[in-house]
Amino acid sequence: MQITDVRIRKISAEGKMKAIVSVTFDNEFVVHDIKVIEGQNGLFIAMPSRKTPTGEFKDIAHPINTETRQKIQKAILDEYEVVKNETTNNENGEEITSED
């Protein structure tokens, strides 16, 4: 399984959530609404989730092993850094996405 596209939508509001991401796998399957969060130990990703009637959050889609989670997180955070730097240098403030 290869990550074939990462699309970053930066969040301009102040807060811990920095971006919302869509990731495409093998040009065939996409997962939307992955969040880039600023935590105490740096950036990390949160998979898309929904709130249950009991108030608990359950992932809608998620990797089933650590290796895959790390692969997805690295691809997202690497692309986030590129987009963050490009946006800083973009005078028009346009949204920037990247396709691999």
UniProtKB/Swiss-Prot annotation:
Superkingdom per UniProt: Bacteria
Record keywords: Cell cycle, Cell division, Septation
Membership in a protein family: Belongs to the SpoVG family.
GO-annotated biological processes: division septum assembly; sporulation resulting in formation of a cellular spore
A Pfam family of this chain: SpoVG
Keyword Cell division among record annotations: yes
Name of the protein: Putative septation protein SpoVG
Keyword Cell membrane listed: no
Ranges that cross the membrane: none
Record-linked PANTHER family: SEPTATION PROTEIN SPOVG-RELATED
